[in-house]
Curated annotation (Swiss-Prot):
Catalytic machinery residues: 315, 317, 352
Entry protein name: Palmitoyl-acyl carrier protein thioesterase, chloroplastic
Natural source organism: Arabidopsis thaliana
Effect of residue 259 to M: Loss of activity
Signal peptide residue numbers: none
Its job: Plays an essential role in chain termination during de novo fatty acid synthesis. Possesses high thioesterase activity for palmitoyl-ACP versus other acyl-ACPs. Substrate preference is 16:0 > 18:1 > 18:0 > 16:1. Plays an essential role in the supply of saturated fatty acids necessary for plant growth and seed development. Contributes to 16:0 production particularly in flowers. May be involved in the synthesis of long chain fatty acid.
Miscellaneous comment as given in the Swiss-Prot or TrEMBL entry: Plants silencing FATB, show reduced level of palmitate in flowers and seeds.
Activity versus pH, per record: Optimum pH is 9.7.
Localization, UniProt: Plastid, Chloroplast
Protein EC: 3.1.2.-
Gene Ontology MF terms in the entry: acyl carrier activity; fatty acyl-[ACP] hydrolase activity
InterPro entries documented for this protein: Acyl-ACP-thioesterase_N, Acyl-ACP_TE_C, Acyl-ACP_thioesterase_NHD, FATA/B, HotDog_dom_sf
Transmembrane residue ranges: none
Comp. bias (Polar residues): 1-19, 27-40
Length: 412
């Protein structure tokens, strides 16, 4: 139908009326037997009895009774030219443009009708900020694992996982309508120059997602002591529902002007308490003491670590996720290549500013550092400190053997 209507404007449809001579032929018929060439508008037409004008002294003069030779144009013709196949041919450039338009429109319609999501994760809005579920107490957000969020083994890095946790925490506050002008601060916190700082983080990774996977992150908050708040996360595979990561953290308030810890004011407590969930932590607390290490007990030391401008958050200190990358700077390459990080416990003891210079120390326990290639489970103690020796973060990581995967560019 589309093609017929479009081309009809270029190829006139013959009329069904009959020849007035009664011969039964339709006007506009394509019978080529009686075709005549279309009259030329520039042809000369001679009147009867016309004579060539004589010349006198080289000039033409008219004679009595003579007739002039006149040219007739289509504009002055009293009878229109007969309709023939030749003079009804269209402008081919216009016809080509019409055909192109028809095919483009048909292709677009076909694509719209034929498009079907091949996987459920194709329906994920990558720019959505999630939604509140479970009676308004749990915030849920989906993330698609991007190509720039994976490591050499094709799986998401621990920094990617931690960034997803942080993003859902902030979006939870925003969606609940509690976001002031600060970085996760409520309106009352903003008035009192208060910000949240994390003091403890515990993460257990059962399985790392890979490129293209979609993860579903749930987060909620609970009270922690008199002046703290606990935030938990549960990360699952969006398609299978398999649990991938569990994490729990403790947060306290700090005055951003004095940089000192603060109690939770009653006005702020009134804002956040309606969102507290009365539940146990998603992870049982690892009560083992984090061992302090130094130059003598550390197996690996990395010095001269400095923040980049992009490492700072809006509170003008280094983002807590960045500390994880610095801690792993001193981890042995043998562990990074053959082991996967399965759990991590961090204690944040001091903030780090733009001009800080740090050292990263790692001590390997549970195996001989000379046999990391054949080691099974490995445990490491970590310390991140300033040049003057002040502790920034203490940590413990546990590692297990990676599942063999196919390397890029090799045959399976």
């Amino acid at each position: 139908m589309v093609a017929t209507s479009a081309t009809s404007s270029f190829f006139p449809v013959p009329s069904s009326s009959l020849d007035p001579n009664g011969k039964g032929n339709k006007i506009g018929s394509t019978n080529l037997a009686g075709l005549n060439s279309a009259p030329n508008s520039g042809r000369m037409k001679v009147k009867p009895n016309a004579q060539a004008p004589p010349k006198i002294n080289g000039k033409k003069v008219g004679l009595p009774g003579s007739v002039d030779i006149v040219r007739t144009d289509t504009e002055t013709s009293s009878h229109p030219a007969p309709r023939t196949f030749i003079n009804q041919l269209p402008d081919w450039s216009m016809l080509l443009a019409a055909i192109t338009t028809i095919f483009l429109a048909a292709e677009k319609q076909w694509m719209m009708l034929d498009w079907k999501p091949r996987r459920s994760d194709m329906l994920v809005d990558p720019f959505g900020i999630g939604r509140i579920v479970q009676d308004g107490l749990v915030f849920r957000q989906n993330f698609s694992i991007r190509s720039y969020e994976i490591g050499a083994d094709r799986s998401a890095s621990i920094e990617t996982v931690m960034n997803h946790l942080q993003e859902t925490a902030l979006n939870h506050v925003k969606t609940a309508g509690l976001l002031g002008d600060g970085f996760g601060s409520t309106p009352e916190m903003f008035k009192k120059n208060l910000i949240w700082v994390v003091t403890r983080m515990q993460v257990v990774v059962d399985k790392y997602p890979t490129w293209g996977d979609v993860v579903e992150v749930d987060t909620w908050v609970s009270q922690s002591g008199k002046n703290g708040m606990r935030r938990d996360w549960l990360v699952r595979d969006c398609n299978t529902g398999e649990t991938l990561t569990r994490a729990s953290s403790v947060w306290v308030m700090m005055n951003k002007l004095t940089r000192r810890l603060s109690k939770i004011p009653e006005e702020v407590r009134g804002e956040i308490e309606p969102y507290f969930v009365n539940s146990d932590p998603v992870l049982a607390e690892d009560s083992r003491k984090l061992t302090k290490i130094d130059d003598k007990t550390a197996d690996y030391v990395r010095s001269g670590l400095t923040p980049r401008w992009s490492d700072l958050d809006v509170n003008q200190h280094v983002n807590n996720v960045k500390y994880i990358g610095w801690i792993l700077e001193s981890a042995p390459v043998g562990i990074m290549e053959r082991q996967k990080l399965k759990s991590m416990t961090l204690e944040y003891r001091r903030e780090c500013g733009r001009d800080s210079v740090l050292q990263s120390l790692t001590a390997v326990t549970g195996c001989d550092i000379g046999n990391l290639a054949t080691a099974g489970d490995v445990e490491c103690q970590h310390l991140l400190r300033l040049q003057d020796g002040a502790e920034v973060v203490r940590g413990r990581t546990e590692w297990s053997s990676k599942t063999p995967t196919t390397t890029w560019g090799t045959a399976p």
